[in-house]
Amino acid sequence: MEEDLFQLRQLPVVKFRRTGESARSEDDTASGEHEVQIEGVRAGLEAVELDDGAAVPKEFANPTDDTFMVEDAVEAIGFGKFQWKLSVLTGLAWMADAMEMMILSILAPQLHCEWRLPSWQVALLTSVVFVGMMSSSTLWGNISDQYGRKTGLKISVLWTLYYGILSAFAPVYSWILVLRGLVGFGIGGVPQSVTLYAEFLPMKARAKCILLIEVFWAIGTVFEVVLAVFVMPSLGWRWLLILSAVPLLLFAVLCFWLPESARYDVLSGNQEKAIATLKRIATENGAPMPLGKLIISRQEDRGKMRDLFTPHFRWTTLLLWFIWFSNAFSYYGLVLLTTELFQAGDVCSISSRKKAVEAKCSLACEYLSEEDYMDLLWTTLSEFPGVLVTLWIIDRLGRKKTMALCFVVFSFCSLLLFICVGRNMLTLLLFIARAFISGGFQAAYVYTPEVYPTATRALGLGTCSGMARVGALITPFIAQVMLESSVYLTLAVYSGCCLLAALASCFLPIETKGRGLQESSHREWGQEMVGRGAHGTGVARSNSGSQE
């Protein structure tokens, strides 16, 4: 075996990293081609391609000038105790976000009856939350890119906690309208927890971990319904609002442990802070730090909207905006439709719908019954199989095909509701539809942080989240107002929107499956080191992979 070993001994030095990218010495950048002479090995070697994230053999290392990037360190340290703690902490933020969203479908019918609100005011109460989220999502993304992921997330959570508790003491409709809007403004920053979380995850674990963090969303929605079952009959909606803020309070107490992203620190020039964070992770995980010197990435302007519309990202950004719009439009529409359809009973009976319209026009109302809560709980439990299905297919089909499949299944279930079905079949169809639309949402949360570079990752996720809130803003007027006029038209709108979103998913120019996170907006996607042998020479080139 000893005679098979060989060494690289040709300058300029080619350093192989786990990211699959190449770094060349500045003396020979003009030629674009770098030869590596291999001593003692015959000519005619076949091309060898190093996969992204592949470990580099020690015999290829440069013993005199070892360097590494944050991506290398994260891959070397791996997944361990630190990431488990981070999962729980960011999961609390997600759980709180889910509870604040789920409470809308419970609070709306309650206030409709208690305060004798017309349908448009009930819809407005839901929409104002999404107005706040829409107006703040880009702002929180910009703050996270400019001042750090931890800073943006902490401020948004504390903001939501403060106004969430205040809204429980609202004396009249106008007060709760304003306060819930301010709650929505704070919730707009909670998705930045995904940005922070993703930047600490090794490549092989990233998709699975981001999907598993979505389990906390499912737990939040289920917990909110269970909480409502016990709290609403005895204590009322004000106590429900107060108790729903408990996960936010826990996050506020525990967030002192939360570190800043090492990727952000390097990009902003804080090399020492980044190294300290990486050493902390290595210590907690019981893994060694990479040897050598941490490379400081070229400092770039961060959080600039124009960077989302460079030729490389323009179509990705526009298509993602529509995908996120459709996800939220359909997901929250289904959440609101669930309570409306269960209260209506036979959704296929036109005469019953007319009676319901007449009743609602006279401001008659129905409180959610115990049966309504149980059916709501069953459909909410669909979040869990949604996570499991997405977890199983996302690394097999890829991110794009997973999103497309979820949209298609949701559309199919929506169309089946055109058939006259009983309550049990209605519950089953809503269960399947919600499982897959939540799965599509989860896949989008995996794809978006992966496709944007560190300099614009938070802003990219923030703008996508903002477009999602536009969809959520519109959906109450479809699910609660249009439903009174036509059940079929309402279902057709949701089904058609998701079919278009499925097409948009297929046309995304970049597939991020198996890719490392991009550090710089000046690097092309899919750069790989390829060793080519011809006539006794190995040639290493940096090739830009095509956009799939």
UniProtKB/Swiss-Prot annotation:
Gene3D superfamilies: MFS general substrate transporter like domains. Residues 528-548 are annotated as: Disordered. The lineage of its organism: Eukaryota, Metazoa, Chordata, Craniata, Vertebrata. Keywords: Cytoplasmic vesicle, Membrane, Phosphoprotein, Synapse, Transmembrane, Transmembrane helix, Transport. It is a multi-pass membrane protein. Pfam families: MFS_1, Sugar_tr. One of its GO terms (molecular function) is transmembrane transporter activity. The chain crosses the membrane at residues 88-108, 123-143, 157-177, 181-201, 210-230, 239-259, 317-337, 374-394, 402-422, 426-446, 458-478, 490-510. InterPro entries: MFS, MFS_dom, MFS_sugar_transport-like, MFS_trans_sf, Orgcat_transp/SVOP, SVOP-like_MFS_dom. Residues 1-87, 144-156, 202-209, 260-316, 395-401, 447-457, 511-548 are cytoplasmic. Detected in brain and adrenal medulla. This is Synaptic vesicle 2-related protein. Belongs to the major facilitator superfamily. It comes from the Eukaryota. It comes from Bos taurus. One of its GO terms (cellular component) is synaptic vesicle membrane. Residues 109-122, 178-180, 231-238, 338-373, 423-425, 479-489 are vesicular. It is found in: Cytoplasmic vesicle, Secretory vesicle, Synaptic vesicle membrane. PANTHER family: MAJOR FACILITATOR-TYPE TRANSPORTER HXNZ-RELATED (PTHR23511:SF5), SYNAPTIC VESICLE GLYCOPROTEIN 2 (PTHR23511). The modification Phosphoserine is found at S25, S31, S542.
